Amino acid sequence: MSWLVGALQTFGSLADVAGTVSNIVYQQRQAAQLEKQNELMETWMNKQEALQKSQMELTRDLSINGPAARVQSALDAGFDEVSARRIAGSGERVIWGNLDRPIMHAGTMDSIRQTRHLDSLSHSLATFKNGTPFGKPAPPTAKSGRPQATTAQITIGHNPGSTSV
């Protein structure tokens, strides 16, 4: 019987040793996985940092050179200088007569300038508003020289009326 008990104890001890060895192997694999995960995380963080630096440089460049690049792009597309600045966001207004001119392509601008239709419409609207210059009195002229001295006048005995409520 002792032989059987000894064999069972041996098998039990071998099973314990096998469990311990498999536990050690598992822990080594787990440590290797964590090391690989840390390396991947470090690589990812380095790439994120590089992307953020690149984004900051791009934002800085666009904030400095962006408006000029938009104006140049609009000029290259065929817009005149004022329209190109307006496209870039300058907020300028161009008023011809009584009309606020929209943003136009340079070819459109040339055709308007050649026909002068917009100018004639503006003059006709101004005629309706101001009338014709014929038969009007001359506009006042500016006086030259020193101004005339005037004396102050004080009204004494002013009696403001009374009210009854």
Swiss-Prot record:
Coiled-coil residue spans: none
Organism superkingdom: Viruses
Compartment(s) of residence: Virion; Host cytoplasm
Biased composition, class Polar residues, residue ranges: 147-165
Pfam families referenced in this protein's UniProt entry, alphabetically: Calici_MSP
One GO cellular component term noted in the UniProt record for this chain: host cell cytoplasm
Main localization, broad class: virion
Keywords from the named record: Capsid decoration protein, Capsid protein, Host cytoplasm, Virion
Family note: Belongs to the vesivirus VP2 protein family.
Subunit structure: Homooligomer. The portal-like structure consists in 12 copies of VP2. Interacts with capsid protein VP1.
Extra facts: Translated by a ribosomal termination-reinitiation process from the bicistronic mRNA coding for VP1 and VP2.
This protein's name: Minor capsid protein VP2
Origin species: Sapporo virus (isolate GI/Human/Germany/pJG-Sap01)
